[in-house]
């Protein structure tokens, strides 16, 4: 197994997000439908959001670059470069307060 440069991947995905009509891009770093553990690098251009959705299992966000706000029924949580956020097991959304890249880690239920 080769090492993966998260910095290079983050740069590439952020460039893709900036050029995308929806203002976001994603790349599965590890896992997939057949794995309980999934890690996805998400890039969002400033002002873009992931609409409210259910938490698919235990989940965390690591902010690789930028600043994001995780919105939940218990209130918003802001995170900047280097911050680690545990996503509560409830409906939530994510907003990029500036161009941002996060690593989403999920362990699926069941």
What are these regions (language model features)?
Residues 1-36, 71:
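A short, N-terminal "cap"/entry segment at the start of jelly-roll beta-barrel domains
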Residues 89-110:
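Ligand-binding loop in jelly-roll beta-barrel domains
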Residues 23, 38-55, 81, 89:
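Conserved short histidine dyad/triad with adjacent acidic residue
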Residues 50-52, 70-71, 92-97:
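Short beta-strand His + acidic residue motifs that chelate non-heme Fe in jelly-roll/DSBH
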Residues 57-73:
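Glycine- and acidic-residue-biased ligand/ion/polar-headgroup-sensing regions
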Residues 73-90:
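Short acidic-glycine-tyrosine-enriched beta hairpin
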Residues 64-65, 80-81, 98:
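A cytosolic small-molecule/anion-sensing beta-strand core signal
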